[in-house]
Amino acid sequence: MAVIRGWDFPEDLYYQVEKHVWVRRLSADVVQVGLTPVGYELLRHSLTAISVRTKNIGQVVSKGKSIAMVESLKYIGPLAAPITGVLLRANERLQDDPDSAPADPYGEGWIAELQPLDWESESAALVTGEAAMTAYETWLSSEKIAWE
């Protein structure tokens, strides 16, 4: 696990850095999606709700389209799908306890599970490993973010 400016970043995950989204490949047919600690910090840890559009369970969600709504005291907006896939499941725990997500963003704080429809080509737009760590450090520097 890499630590960048005080935040943990597992190097085996895939990241959409500019959206602060991580993707964990559970199997060839299932990925988990969640927000990074930086994403939660930008929300100021004041989550009031994370709601996955459960009416869309079983439906195809295109890359860039909303798979969840994130609400904090200062922001309400969509969490965009980092890849195209069938929405399989929402983390129902977050409905009752949205603050558990920032406490364990890579574990109990996952937001949704998708069945990727074109993992091979769409995952190429995500970064992983050392490239992800470099991309996050570059983003934090460019945005002049230095929380720790």
What kind of feature is each model-predicted range?
Residues 1-63, 108-119, 126-133, 137-148:
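Acidic, low-complexity mobile loops and tails
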Residues 25-28, 89-96, 121:
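Short, conserved beta-turn/loop elements at beta-strand boundaries and strand-helix junctions
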Residues 30, 84-86:
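Structural motif
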Residues 86-115:
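Aromatic- and Lys/Arg-enriched surface recognition patch
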